[in-house]
UniProtKB/Swiss-Prot annotation:
Name of this chain's protein: [Phe6]-mosact
High-level lineage: Eukaryota, Metazoa, Echinodermata, Eleutherozoa, Echinozoa
Biological function: Stimulates sperm respiration and motility.
Superkingdom of the source species: Eukaryota
């Protein structure tokens, strides 16, 4: 999901 993108980068 879109929340996961900020957790990675």
């Amino acid at each position: 999901d879109s929340d996961s993108a900020f957790l990675i980068g």
